[in-house]
């Protein structure tokens, strides 16, 4: 899930300290890195990759994702981050070829140290665990993953009443 990298609308908290141009440049670099890792995962047939975008319309999203080599894409829609993630789980399951055998992994798009081994390790851990969180230093998490077992049994997902963009996210989840 990501915001379209538009001047003044991405990395808004960071832009207060480094300026909007630098924030945009950093957003584009981190997106490029995330897509590079994601495309490697897809090309190795380790996992399907989907992107959920906000900040642009459907036609622009189609063009952008085509240029990135990403075939599965969605608009995020309205609501808080939790509502958007829950919506993406249902969309992904509905549109997946193997929807009943599918784990769902959300990763941040602002992870300069992300590697394909992070994803491979998460997939491996999902064989035994139903929910995995990759905690971050700011009280949130950089990854949240659900096993297909968990998703198939739970219509409730832990995204309700969370103070998003705060140091309470991990605790609230």
Regions found by a protein language model. Give the residues of each.
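Short aromatic-hydrophobic micro-motifs that form the base-stacking/packing surface
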Residues: 103-107
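Active-site rim beta-loop-alpha module in soluble metabolic enzymes
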Residues: 135-136, 141-142, 146-148, 155
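Short beta-strand/loop segment that forms part of the nucleotide-sugar
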Residues: 47-56
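Active-site oxyanion/phosphate-handling segment shared across diverse enzymes
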Residues: 152-173
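A short, N-terminal amphipathic alpha-helix
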Residues: 25-44
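Short phosphate-binding loop-to-helix
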Residues: 59-102, 163
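Conserved donor-nucleotide/metal-binding helix-loop-beta segment in metal-dependent transferases, i.e.
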Residues: 112-140
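N-terminal nucleotide-binding beta1-loop-alpha1 segment
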Residues: 1-14
């Amino acid at each position: 899930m990501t915001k379209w990298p538009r001047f003044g609308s991405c990395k808004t908290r960071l832009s207060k300290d480094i300026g909007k141009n630098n924030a945009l440049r950093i957003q584009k670099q981190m997106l490029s890195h995330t897509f590079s890792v994601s495309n490697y995962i897809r090309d190795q047939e380790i996992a399907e990759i989907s992107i959920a975008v906000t900040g642009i319309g459907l036609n622009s999203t189609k063009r952008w994702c085509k240029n990135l080599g990403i075939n599965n894409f969605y608009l995020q829609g309205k609501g808080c981050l939790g509502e958007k993630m829950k919506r993406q789980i249902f969309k992904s399951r509905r549109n997946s070829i193997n929807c009943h055998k599918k784990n769902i992994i959300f990763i941040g798009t602002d992870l300069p140290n992300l590697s394909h081994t992070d994803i491979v390790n998460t997939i491996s851990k999902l064989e035994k665990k139903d929910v995995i969180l990759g905690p971050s230093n700011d009280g949130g998490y950089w990854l949240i993953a659900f096993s297909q077992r968990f998703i198939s049994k739970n219509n409730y997902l832990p995204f309700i009443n969370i103070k998003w963009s705060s140091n309470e996210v991990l605790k609230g989840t």
